[in-house]
């Protein structure tokens, strides 16, 4: 009972839904509204349908048949010998892999997530751009990295940095939906002030993000200017 469908499937992607959106969807299936709350709670803990023991088997089978529930699968795990840092390779439903990093500090835990499979930005110092951009990640695939890392380490995640594979502002809609999902009080409840969005400098995306009214930290990579020739290099910020 996996609930996974081929990438691009028309089946609703339930991990990309807010709790209220999930409530509406579950009610549309003829099920009780409170079942959505139970399901949402399980998904935020990274549980598979077989682990959702307080939900009827018939309900789980129905959702697995009708919906797309995408979880990140740990394909590889690399643990630091110096501290509690763990680097993950997560396999997505279509076989693409993305990287995430779990970091633990005195003040809490942070996960660095990817926003795309591959990258189109062409920064020569970054290996992520070698094969170009394969595709954007869905909100659920970005959120799933945070959930999977927390589940694997048995830790609450306190912060997020969007500094993995891909350019978050080149996948704007998924990035913004992810930010709303990961900061939701009904979900992982990670404060927006504990989230950093890294960009190589997509100005229209920066302006749009500022207009969203979400107090995330914006990190601009100045390394992307290294290979710009001197005559065309912008003035220092």
What residues fall within each predicted segment?
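Flexible, acidic/Gly-rich N-terminal and inter-domain linker regions that tether
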Residues: 1-109
